[in-house]
């Protein structure tokens, strides 16, 4: 605004301010949530006042790239306190027009003959003597400066063709506007000015230099504007929890919430990952892989509260009723009606099966994560919306009911949480996967942890570990055979290192969602509509590209890739060894940043789908992140500080982590006249003892020479896992004349990791560790035979293992 009359600018400025604020409140409703709304309000246009010609030119030069428009008087001084120049305003307009032919100008004057100059420079004219000057000013500013709705006009008659209220409407109408009208607006920068006034600076700045002079093709312009808007909306949607609005949720939306309560543990974790991927550009660097989270809508905890109260469910829920009774009551209850339309909108956008996951307040909390206590249901996508709605609401009620099932109540007690503090949010998410006939499943699912307590070879504890499987992730949670590897050493995989192990210890079955089961009999088992299939079925579906290898029984060899005949072995060889898909690299990034931003070790669930075409591309979806907190895993003590006279066993090369203090027994192989030729008999004897421990529900420490579980009886005692399954710590002790390289328990590796068993290697005669056999020999034996001795103590022997430093000790009883 250029004006030197105090009376005039005292009336113009408040008038403009009122107008601008009202506008910015209107367009801030487009923002996705409260945070973005505030940012939008702050991005409103600013009003600057100049009182002289020099000041005006100075301001124009400084801000000329961001000016929405200029309002000027005609008579005002050239310099401060100078003489008034009768045509200063006209000269200003001429100077500005030279620089920018399109910026809107408004001339206001009390001398009506200046109207002629106004038309010469394409400016609007306002008569200061008019009674309705304020109203005129508002109208002209609104029409010319890009405020209000965007109106497409016919350039010849200036009548309205179309009206656009927000970005989504503009995106939808772009290709429908007639070419001449479109041309009229882009050649005058109207689109970018409208975006500026609505505080959408990135798009506006991108579009401003693209004028008719620089690109003379209407359709190319439409395309550029469309793509810019789509990119902007995607950028704005990623890493943000938007408020769910029916008219705004479309395929560019990523994460929205219904309700105002908490998102719960998993919901927060998802929002956290989404934000993390957005802030680290490295995730964008893969040509054939996209990293994302599935489309998600969260029903916040206040929906749960409302559901429980309006249906009077607390009484049944908190009683000691059977689980299925509770479930029946919940299924009869009604969800709030306003959700129906929201769900329909969601179905239209997602068009794939949905997973309904629990996200409770206490789940994945930093100190006592609750994992796997509540139910997760999956439902197929149906064309019949109402049928799908019925399944969805049943699933939501099923998840709500599972808060009050027996197991959850017991778990609550065990972790000293109060059940009425537990509230449940529900996550609705597209299921990651491809459809194969009546089945639906991803190419791979997995769980990655940023700590590895069983590092073998040159792996390091902090490099983390990944368990990978074909099909839905429930297979992993249920303890199926998965492929385990370190993301930094994807070429070294123990399970596929020897053919015999590869055939025995790789995945043979997988889970898929049954698309035919419409869930009429909703049950407490959330896996009721999953199929457990043999890997052969996936081969028929053509889902094993890049994932399987083929066993050739004639040459006794496993070949990477799919070949006719021969059993298919799930090795993920092409992905891990030949890097067809950058899975290992993505996992390195995810674990690195996840741990960095949570400031503690994390566990991440993910799934990936490979495209059906042969172009080797795929999408990697992050499903969940939770901090790793195990009471076992809080070991802060320095084990090297404990003196040798207090320990029974000490190993400087141990696997496993944690503290155990409920072991009272040690079984050890006597070393006095030991000879490897008796190993087979020793194995049978251990099996008998182990059975007694299993029957009594007790555990023990097992010590013996050489490699446990070796199939070569000269290298060690040939036990199988079931024969020693009650042992919590297994020790390989070398003898002077019988020294064996540590096998690190490779024969039972899967079992060691899943049961958290410690594995020590000690060569005491070489000063590598401590093994106080004299102390054991001095104790009375419960059972003694030619080769074995079993000692029981009144007080427990405490086991402490530090997985990061590979140290382990067993203390003397009572220490």
Task: Locate predicted features.
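Acidic, metal-coordinating helix/loop segments flanking the phosphotransfer/catalytic sites
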Residues: 27-69, 77
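Conserved mixed alpha/beta core segments that line enzyme active sites in large multi-domain catalysts
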Residues: 244-285, 334-734, 751-754, 780, ...
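Death-fold homotypic interaction modules
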Residues: 71, 140-199
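Conserved acidic segment of CheY-like receiver
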Residues: 1-7, 12-36, 47-49
């Amino acid at each position: 605004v250029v004006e030197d009359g105090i009376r005039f600018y005292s009336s113009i400025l408040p008038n403009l301010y009122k107008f601008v604020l009202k506008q910015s409140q209107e367009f801030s409703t487009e923002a996705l949530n409260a945070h973005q709304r505030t940012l939008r309000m702050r991005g409103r246009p600013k009003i600057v006042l100049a009182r002289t010609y020099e000041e005006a030119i100075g301001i124009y030069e400084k801000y000329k790239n961001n000016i929405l428009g200029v309002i000027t008087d005609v008579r005002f001084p050239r310099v401060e306190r100078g003489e008034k120049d009768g045509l200063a305003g006209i000269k200003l307009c001429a100077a500005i027009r030279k620089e920018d032919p399109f910026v809107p100008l408004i001339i206001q004057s009390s001398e009506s003959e200046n109207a002629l100059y106004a038309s010469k420079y394409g400016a609007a004219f306002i008569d200061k003597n008019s009674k309705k000057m304020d109203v005129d000013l508002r109208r002209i500013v609104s029409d010319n400066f890009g405020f209000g709705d965007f109106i497409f006009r016919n350039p010849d008659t200036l009548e309205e063709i179309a009206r656009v209220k927000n970005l989504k409407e503009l995106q939808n109408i772009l290709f429908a506007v007639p070419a001449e009208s479109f041309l009229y607006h882009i050649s005058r920068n109207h689109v970018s000015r409208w975006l500026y006034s609505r505080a959408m600076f990135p798009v506006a700045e991108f579009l401003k230099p693209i004028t008719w002079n620089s690109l003379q093709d209407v359709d190319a312009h439409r395309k550029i504007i469309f793509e810019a808007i789509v990119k902007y909306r995607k950028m704005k949607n990623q890493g943000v929890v938007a408020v769910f609005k029916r008219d705004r949720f479309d395929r560019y939306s990523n994460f929205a919430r219904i309700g105002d309560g908490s998102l719960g543990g998993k919901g927060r974790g998802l929002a956290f990952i989404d934000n993390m991927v957005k802030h680290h550009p490295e995730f964008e660097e893969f040509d054939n892989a996209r990293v994302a989270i599935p489309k998600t809508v969260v029903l916040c905890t206040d929906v749960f509260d409302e559901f429980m109260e309006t249906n009077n469910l607390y009484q049944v829920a908190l009683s000691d009723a059977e689980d299925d009774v509770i479930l029946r009551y919940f299924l009869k209850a009604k969800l709030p009606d306003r959700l129906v339309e929201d769900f329909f909108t969601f179905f239209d956008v997602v068009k794939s099966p949905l997973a309904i996951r629990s996200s409770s307040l206490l789940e994945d909390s930093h100190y006592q994560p609750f994992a796997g206590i509540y139910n997760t249901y999956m439902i197929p996508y149906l064309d019949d919306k109402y049928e799908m709605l019925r399944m969805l609401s049943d699933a939501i009620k099923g998840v709500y009911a599972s808060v009050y099932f027996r197991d959850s109540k017991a778990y609550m007690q065990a972790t000293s949480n109060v059940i009425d503090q537990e509230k449940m949010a529900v996550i609705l998410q597209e299921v990651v996967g491809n459809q194969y006939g009546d089945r639906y499943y991803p190419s791979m699912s997995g769980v990655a942890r940023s700590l590895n307590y069983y590092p073998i070879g040159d792996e390091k504890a902090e490099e983390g570990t990944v368990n990978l499987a074909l099909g839905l992730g429930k297979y992993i949670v249920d303890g199926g055979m998965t492929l385990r590897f370190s993301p930094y050493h994807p070429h070294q995989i123990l399970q596929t290192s020897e053919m015999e192990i590869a055939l025995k210890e790789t995945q043979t079955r997988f889970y898929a969602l049954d698309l035919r089961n419409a869930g009429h009999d909703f049950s407490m088992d959330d896996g009721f509509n999953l199929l457990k299939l043999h890997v052969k079925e996936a081969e028929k579906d053509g889902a094993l590209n890049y994932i399987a290898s083929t066993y050739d029984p004639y040459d006794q060899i496993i070949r990477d890739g799919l070949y006719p005949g021969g059993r298919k072995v799930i090795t993920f060889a092409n992905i891990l060894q030949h890097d067809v898909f950058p899975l290992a690299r993505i996992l390195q990034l995810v674990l690195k940043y996840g741990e960095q931003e949570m400031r503690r070790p994390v566990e991440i669930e993910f799934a990936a789908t490979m495209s059906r075409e042969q172009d080797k591309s795929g999408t990697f979806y992050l499903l969940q992140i939770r901090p790793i907190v195990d009471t076992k895993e809080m070991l802060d003590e320095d084990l090297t500080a404990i003196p040798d006279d207090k320990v029974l066993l000490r190993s400087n090369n141990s696997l496993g982590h944690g503290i155990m203090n409920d072991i009272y027994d040690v079984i050890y192989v006597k070393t006095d006249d030991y000879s490897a030729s008796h190993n087979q008999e020793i194995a049978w004897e251990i099996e008998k003892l182990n059975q007694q421990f299993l029957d009594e529900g007790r555990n023990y420490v097992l010590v013996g020479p050489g490699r446990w579980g070796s199939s070569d009886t000269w290298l060690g005692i040939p036990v199988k896992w079931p024969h020693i399954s009650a042992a919590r710590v297994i020790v390989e002790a070398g003898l002077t004349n019988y020294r064996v390289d540590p096998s690190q328990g490779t024969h039972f590796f899967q079992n060691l990791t899943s049961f958290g068993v410690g594995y020590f290697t000690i060569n005491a005669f070489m000063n590598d560790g401590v093994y106080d056999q004299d102390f054991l020999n001095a104790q009375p034996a419960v059972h003694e035979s030619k080769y074995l001795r079993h000692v029981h103590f009144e007080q427990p022997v405490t086991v402490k293992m530090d997985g990061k430093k590979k140290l382990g000790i067993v203390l003397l009883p009572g220490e």
